[in-house]
Amino acid sequence: MKKYLLIISLWLGIGFSNAQPLSGYYDSVDGKKAQAVKTALCDAIDEHTQRTYKDLWADFRTTDCRPDGKVWDMYSSITHYVFGTDQNTGGGGREGADYNREHSMPKSWFHDGYPMYTDLFHMYPTDSYINNMRGNYPFGEVGTVTKQSNGG
């Protein structure tokens, strides 16, 4: 029992120690109230740079790179994709042909609108064939599996 409490305590301690905002990030909000707080917060995030759909290819090199330098595909165990070389070549007629960009929430749900369309927090490199097969279905549990990707 002591072992479990120690592990939980360490886990919580590490989690909370990393959950601190950048030093000075909220300084402009200190002492303000109501509308002034809203304005100060808006000003703090005003320098956000909206990514283009094309920018995501380069962003994936940082966000979804495996330790061996290959693309981290969330749908398939076919993991030989090379950044730049294997990105959406227009193929995708079979699993393992190439990878493309996947929205975690179907883009039709927000009418392909910006900034959601290129929000990197909701974008993943995925096997093109499996991504196209998924269509606009939400993530969730299914009663009967009709198609399953390699390892998925």
Which residues does each PLM region occupy?
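A short, polar/charged loop/turn motif at coil->beta-strand junctions and beta-hairpin connectors
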Residues: 6, 68, 95-98
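Hydrophobic alpha-helical membrane context
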Residues: 14-15, 115
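Short, His- and charge-rich active-site/binding loops that engage polyanionic ligands
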Residues: 73, 78-98
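Domain-level detector of nuclease and nuclease-like folds
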Residues: 89-152
